[in-house]
Amino acid sequence: MTSPVLVDIREEVTCPICLELLTEPLSIDCGHSFCQACITPNGRESVIGQEGERSCPVCQTSYQPGNLRPNRHLANIVRRLREVVLGPGKQLKAVLCADHGEKLQLFCQEDGKVICWLCERSQEHRGHHTFLVEEVAQEYQEKFQESLKKLKNEEQEAEKLTAFIREKKTSWKNQMEPERCRIQTEFNQLRNILDRVEQRELKKLEQEEKKGLRIIEEAENDLVHQTQSLRELISDLERRCQGSTMELLQDVSDVTERSEFWTLRKPEALPTKLRSMFRAPDLKRMLRVCRELTDVQSYWVDVTLNPHTANLNLVLAKNRRQVRFVGAKVSGPSCLEKHYDCSVLGSQHFSSGKHYWEVDVAKKTAWILGVCSNSLGPTFSFNHFAQNHSAYSRYQPQSGYWVIGLQHNHEYRAYEDSSPSLLLSMTVPPRRVGVFLDYEAGTVSFYNVTNHGFPIYTFSKYYFPTTLCPYFNPCNCVIPMTLRRPSS
């Protein structure tokens, strides 16, 4: 709070009669000074003695009215004191206490209120720290000026963010319409064939649009509310700073706390691009393959991995539905001699019937999967297989393998009895592959589940002399292969 020196000075320049700062001070012979209006005959009658000679209201020393003289030194001190505590050109206005009718001259620090001397002695304020309003006015004036500066900077930042969000909102809406038109144009060509698929795609886009707009609008609404609250707070502070001392200090604790701790909450990341762009399929073919995929998925079996067939290079998940390559633990030419590779078989054995399972190969740069004869199992190192062209024969049907695979991140191959292996063309790289075994028909088919179930390759018209097992080889890629339930 204000220095005790100001308190002492104020006491020296306070009129003993009206208890206010001296106004046009007059001094008498004893040295005491009073306001001109308080000590002259036209002032307060209670201080006027008898005609002619009068006595000092403080020490009762007699004096002649004609001996009253202006005290310019005190007048200058009072003027300077007012400038220190209130600012140049400002005057205290007398405001009366609503409860006691006395002048509001004190400020209660604990309650942040302006009170009178009777309030100070009441039970409500007993024991509280009180100060003269002149002492605290300048301090709060400076504090509010700092708060105003900070809050106006926040207001400018809020205005910039508002413009930014509106721009993003417009940009987001502009992205929606051309994409919507493109989807509708593609599907209108075959409206009667695949109307259901079109509506599904439009619904997905609409949901993404609504989600994006909701995020943007929530950020915009939050910013509007923050801006409104900020402006109300700024208006309150400006009103207090421009008003009287009473208006400045009344209920000051609340506004002080709000202004000091107010901080603009900035929005989180706003959507800028579609997560995925629509690819128009060959609708006639898509309808056919979708029906085919739906048919084979009805033969789904819950395949699990057999840990007893897993190589030391591999780690299986506890549920035995995921396998991951962790690096070779055997080096040198002994790999081939010990028939060492990185494959694992399924626990299920198939000697009849139709069976289907799906494998997630997303983000893998190399993999091999399909079926193999149960009497074979792992036979050689994949690293050697990738480097030695003649090793392809080890994965051919004549060797008991009906498999396809990925090499070098983009080469998809079917390992037929021909040499070299058959290079496959993929318009959409498969993140999930479906495997369908029809034992009696002698076929093993592979489906690109990622691309609506389009066929990848089919080994057909084979005679399976032995029981078959699902075959999985994550190769030397650390990304796992995972067995999935259809549509999961």
Swiss-Prot record:
Q: Which residues form the B30.2/SPRY domain?
A: 282-488
Mind telling me which GO cellular component terms the entry cites?
cytoplasm; cytosol; nucleus
* Catalytic activity from the UniProt record: S-ubiquitinyl-[E2 ubiquitin-conjugating enzyme]-L-cysteine + [acceptor protein]-L-lysine = [E2 ubiquitin-conjugating enzyme]-L-cysteine + N(6)-ubiquitinyl-[acceptor protein]-L-lysine
GO BP: antiviral innate immune response; cellular response to interferon-beta; cellular response to virus; free ubiquitin chain polymerization; innate immune response; negative regulation of DNA-templated transcription; negative regulation of gene expression; negative regulation of stem cell differentiation
UniProt keyword Hydrolase, yes or no: no
- Tell me the pathway: Protein modification; protein ubiquitination
Q: Give residues annotated as binding Zn(2+).
A: 97, 100, 119, 125
Where are the zinc-finger regions (B box-type) in this chain?
92-133
Coiled-coil ranges (or none): 134-248
Residue spans annotated as Zn fingers (RING-type) read: 15-60
Q: Name one GO molecular function term.
A: protein kinase binding
| Sequence similarity | Belongs to the TRIM/RBCC family.
Q: What is known of its domains?
A: The B-box zinc finger and the linker region between the coiled coil and B30.2/SPRY domains contribute to higher order self-association.
Which named protein is this? Tripartite motif-containing protein 6
Gene of origin?
A: TRIM6
